[in-house]
Swiss-Prot record:
Transmembrane segments: none annotated. This is Deoxyuridine 5'-triphosphate nucleotidohydrolase. The keyword Transmembrane does not apply. It comes from the Bacteria. This enzyme is involved in nucleotide metabolism: it produces dUMP, the immediate precursor of thymidine nucleotides and it decreases the intracellular concentration of dUTP so that uracil cannot be incorporated into DNA. Pfam families: dUTPase (PF00692). Its cofactor is Mg(2+). PANTHER family: DEOXYURIDINE 5'-TRIPHOSPHATE NUCLEOTIDOHYDROLASE. Keywords: Hydrolase, Magnesium, Metal-binding, Nucleotide metabolism. Belongs to the dUTPase family. InterPro entries: dUTPase, dUTPase-like, dUTPase-like_sf, dUTPase_trimeric.
Length: 148
């Protein structure tokens, strides 16, 4: 599938376009479109520009997710993961990041900061009913299926 993309920020000597790291990657890396290093202090958030805008076809969304390395090594994650980019949004993608670690985290220009997964979705219509179908699980939730 081809998706239209507008490059808003051009890195010196590097591309800001999302890229798959391996042939089997589901997510494309997104890069920090910043001109100079940026510090995210412990327990603080930052809105980090990705330097691109996209035009997704109707019926698709882009999901913005944390990178496992940043999460496991530094405690830095995408706050509203997965963040949804709707098919009718045309502005620059920006990533809400939070530092859950104990130390300052330094973002550098062109650093890989998040992943973007393109996903198909269905538009639903609601059918109002008095009762729902019975299931074995019923209304049990919040750990009711056990840990093992």
């Amino acid at each position: 599938m081809k998706v239209k993309i507008k490059q808003i920020y051009q890195f010196e000597g590097a591309s800001s376009l999302p890229a798959y790291s391996t042939n089997g990657s589901a997510g494309m890396d997104l890069y920090a479109a910043i001109a100079s290093p940026m510090i995210i202090k412990p327990h603080e958030t930052a809105l980090v520009p990705a330097g691109i805008a996209i035009s997704l076809p109707y019926g698709y969304e882009a999901q913005i997710r944390s990178r496992s390395g940043l999460a496991s090594k530094f405690g830095v994650i995408v706050l509203n993961s997965p963040g949804t980019i709707d098919s009718d949004y045309r502005g620059e993608l920006k990533i809400i990041m939070i530092n859950l670690g104990q130390k300052d985290f330094q973002l550098t220009p062109a650093m890989r900061i998040a992943q973007m997964v393109i996903a198909k979705y269905e538009v639903v219509s609601w059918e109002l009913v008095d009762d729902l179908d019975e299931t074995e699980r019923g209304k049990n939730g919040f750990g009711s299926s056990g840990l093992k």
